[in-house]
Amino acid sequence: MIFWGCMISAVQPFVEKATRFSLQRLGVALQEMPEATCCPDPEISRTLGGDLWLTLAARNLSIANRTSMDVTVICNGCFETLTKANAELRSDKAVSEKVNSILNRHGREYSGSSQIYHMISFLHDVVGPEAVKSKLVQALSGLKCSPQYGCRILRENLDLAPKFDRLVETLGAQLIHTDTERLCCGVPTMYADPDFSLHERSEVKLREIKQAGAECITLFCPACAERIERAQVTLRSEGEDFNIPVVNYLELLALCLGASPSEIGAHLHRVPLNPILERIRKTP
């Protein structure tokens, strides 16, 4: 069962479109999560109202529990929230009972029967890189991609970074590693200190990525994507020269599986994807 979260559907519909296209081409039947809400956000929501954060997360998990299905998540923030909430509710019976006393009033029950998986794990462990490769009709012909893992998945599961790398290489891209690839993009500090977030996080990452010769930044996290794209727009207004495409891995996958740029809404990016589109080649 897929959990879209709020940001992908509301702000980055091209990621949702690319995901639907990719899963269909890979022969995966997409099971939607009906009546899902925001995860909610693992930073502001949890800080300002921890009990409410946990209850809302449990409500989302109860939807999957009802069908005994596991949950697959694209957004790193959603992954952190649902993973942490699931662990807390499973480990503390008193907390689980308290949350269920609220959910029961609305005809819902958290049972803890569902596992939470990141889309990286699903594509790598369930579908498999070789199966993905066998379906490709186009390849990235050595496109130099800088991976942005996102701090949230690095905190929850260290195995996800190397799996992400392998998935990128499966598409024919060349990974460009930098010393700041595991540095936070700047989203958490953006709310308290926008200047620090822009110049001490986003700009630091962008300078190193540019110096390393990367042609694009690829990631899964919609918050990272939004931050790094917006940062480049702001920095250009300050006289800096940043124009590095920021693209979700699922968009790259869809393009390599045969989607046209217009079909997935590639034109909606603030930083044009032209350098990527020019490098895509038909597979032999």
Name what the model sees in each region:
Residues M1-P284:
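Iron-sulfur cluster-binding electron-transfer modules in prokaryotic oxidoreductases
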